[in-house]
């Protein structure tokens, strides 16, 4: 190290003798490490990454090689002020050490050796107020902090956890979609033989909010086709994603996490934090400053900020990404009582990779789970390997996040005071409801991105007992007016070919009610007459027995936008 100092002095990096002598003394003192919250000097995956970040910044600011930077950092008696929260870090390490997450490897290489000893995981937690990284999980089992840090170094395909970042964020900001926009979730040919599938059954006509709740793939690809992968990549880069290939990743699969290189938990956490922080991306940091032995600050962490989307669209994105934690969603077990919780699951083919990314007003966290060798899946045949019956990444996320929120005041995100408006929306088309729309709900929009009025609706009177067109004999209290038809604007685009288009729940009904007939009405009239003799009474008894319907046909159900009539999805799925 002393030799390095001499070289630095020769190159003019140390300008005078006093500075040189002070540096020599610091070398003899050695490197000191201070936690920003506790002052402890224990070594963790967070600590290891902190030192790497300091070395990287020294290289950039002093324009020196990595070797020179390492020697300067390790041998100059520096004190590094870390952002680690010791309590949060300890909770991560405690959960990562549990054996239930260590699913043994099964596949062997040509030498008969296991490709993987057991599953692994990586996790990063960010404090939303400061955008400081407070904890890192780098491996399952024994904490080998000098090894590969899966929280910061691993890059893997993200699956559906990419949807809020690649589709919703840019889609809202570019006014391609709203929360109410409807697509036909049916098998679709996007060209070049690309026909993605859903992990669960296609839902037919479905809006964006519901798509995220149950993690439908096909509508998200349709969003990407109109938005374009190029535009999506622009936004992803603004959110701190550095591993994208402008050529290889510029395809529709980007919409559902199909990537050439993948993304690290650190960068996923940083990107999600931009949604939590009202649409502003702030680079996550591991240290705040570095001082020398004399107390002089020699390095301050770089923390650049970038406005990605408007405050209003960030609010809407949070609202949409909270759907998976609600009834019928894929991450209901991640909901934190008293906290507004947003969470999105992610899975790749055969569950090779499992993800859970999400946030509360306090923290943002991203967790990956899988095997180091990405050729070994977590789904074999009909068997899906899980932890406690859940997505293992989601179980890690849920257990840790719920614990670190204990004792914190209940909190929701702030709603912008301006720039938002509520409208009554037609559930069948996603347009602003008109007098012809009978199936409606209320949705929130930015003032510059409100849907057009619903078009193409007609109305007809339906018998609620038969579910068919009411005839002249249907009782008035059994007749209701419903809308039919309606234009789905996005499905008029010529950007894809929807195969076997879904049948709309609002299609016109042609069959006429056969339950209520003239004969029954005459019978009813007879019932209202006062019998004049015993024979007439007995005739009425017989008539009632023979003519009264024995069962009441089930009333037609109109799918509820909130998804309450949908079967809750198996939580082991995406």
What are these model-derived regions, one by one?
Residues 4-5, 9, 33-39, 75-83, ...:
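Second-shell loop/turn segments in exported
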Residues 36-39, 176-232, 251, 281, ...:
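Conserved catalytic neighborhood of penicillin-recognizing serine enzymes
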Residues 299-301, 423, 460-465, 479-482, ...:
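Intrinsically disordered, low-complexity repeat and linker tracts
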Residues 82-110, 123-127, 135-138, 142-157, ...:
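A penicillin-recognizing enzyme superfamily signal
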Residues 194-197, 228-270:
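Mid-domain, small-residue-enriched loop/turn segments at the edges of structured enzyme/sensor domains
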Residues 1-83, 90, 237, 241-243, ...:
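Non-catalytic, structured segments within soluble enzyme domains
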Residues 119-120, 144-165, 174, 179-182, ...:
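Short active-site loop at a secondary-structure junction
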Residues 3-10, 22, 45-49, 53, ...:
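Extracytoplasmic/secreted proteins, especially bacterial periplasmic and envelope-associated proteins
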């Amino acid at each position: 190290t002393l030799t390095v100092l001499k070289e630095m002095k020769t190159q003019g990096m140390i300008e005078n003798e006093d500075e040189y002598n002070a540096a020599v003394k610091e070398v003899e003192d050695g490197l000191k490490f201070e936690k920003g919250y506790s002052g402890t000097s224990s070594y963790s995956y967070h600590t290891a990454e902190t030192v790497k970040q300091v070395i990287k910044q020294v290289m950039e600011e002093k324009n020196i090689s990595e070797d020179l930077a390492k020697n300067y950092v390790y041998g100059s008696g520096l004190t590094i002020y870390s952002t680690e929260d010791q309590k949060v870090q300890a909770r991560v390490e405690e959960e990562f050490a549990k054996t239930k997450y260590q699913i043994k490897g099964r596949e062997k290489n040509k030498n008969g050796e296991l490709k993987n000893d057991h599953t692994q995981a990586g996790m990063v937690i960010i404090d939303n107020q400061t955008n400081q990284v407070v904890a890192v999980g780098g491996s399952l089992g024994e904490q080998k902090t000098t090894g590969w840090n899966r929280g910061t170094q691993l890059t893997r395909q993200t699956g559906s956890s990419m949807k809020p970042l690649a589709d919703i964020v840019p889609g809202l900001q570019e006014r391609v979609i709203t929360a109410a926009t409807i697509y036909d979730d049916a098998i679709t040919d996007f060209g070049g033989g690309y026909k993605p599938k859903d992990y669960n059954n296609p839902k037919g006509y479905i809006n964006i909010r519901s798509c995220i709740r149950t993690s439908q793939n096909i509508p998200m690809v349709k969003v990407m086709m109109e938005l374009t992968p190029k535009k999506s990549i622009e936004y992803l880069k603004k959110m701190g994603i550095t591993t994208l290939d402008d050529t290889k990743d510029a395809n529709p699969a980007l919409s559902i996490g199909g990537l050439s290189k993948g993304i690290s938990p650190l960068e996923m956490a940083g990107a999600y934090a931009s949604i939590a922080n009202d649409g502003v991306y702030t680079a996550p940091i591991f240290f705040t400053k570095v001082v020398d032995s004399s107390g002089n600050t020699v390095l301050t962490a770089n923390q650049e900020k970038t406005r990605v989307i408007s405050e209003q669209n960030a609010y809407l994105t949070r609202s949409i990404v909270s759907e998976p934690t609600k009834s019928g969603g894929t991450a209901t077990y991640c909901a934190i009582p008293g906290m507004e919780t947003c969470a999105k699951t992610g899975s790749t083919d055969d569950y090779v990779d499992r993800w859970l990314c999400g946030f509360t007003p306090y923290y943002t966290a991203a967790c990956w789970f899988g095997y180091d060798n990405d050729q070994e899946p977590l789904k074999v045949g009909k068997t899906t390997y899980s932890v406690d019956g859940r997505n293992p990444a989601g179980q890690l996320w849920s257990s840790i996040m719920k614990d670190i929120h204990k004792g914190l005041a209940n909190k929701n995100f702030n709603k912008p005071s301006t720039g938002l408006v509520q409208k009554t929306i037609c559930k069948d088309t996603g347009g602003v409801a008109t007098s012809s729309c009978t199936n409606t709900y209320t949705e929130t929009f930015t003032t510059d991105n409100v849907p057009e009025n619903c078009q193409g609706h007609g109305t007809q009177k339906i018998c609620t007992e038969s579910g068919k067109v009411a005839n002249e004999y249907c009782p008035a209290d059994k007749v209701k007016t419903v809308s039919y038809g309606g234009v789905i604007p996005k499905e008029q685009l010529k950007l894809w070919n929807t195969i076997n288009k879904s049948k709309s729940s609002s299609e016109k009904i042609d069959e006429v009610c056969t339950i209520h007939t003239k004969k029954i009405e005459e019978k009813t009239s007879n019932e209202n007459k006062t019998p004049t003799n015993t024979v007439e009474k007995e005739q009425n008894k017989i008539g009632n027995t023979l003519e009264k319907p024995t069962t009441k046909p089930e009333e037609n159900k109109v799918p509820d936008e909130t998804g309450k009539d949908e079967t809750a999805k198996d939580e082991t799925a995406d």
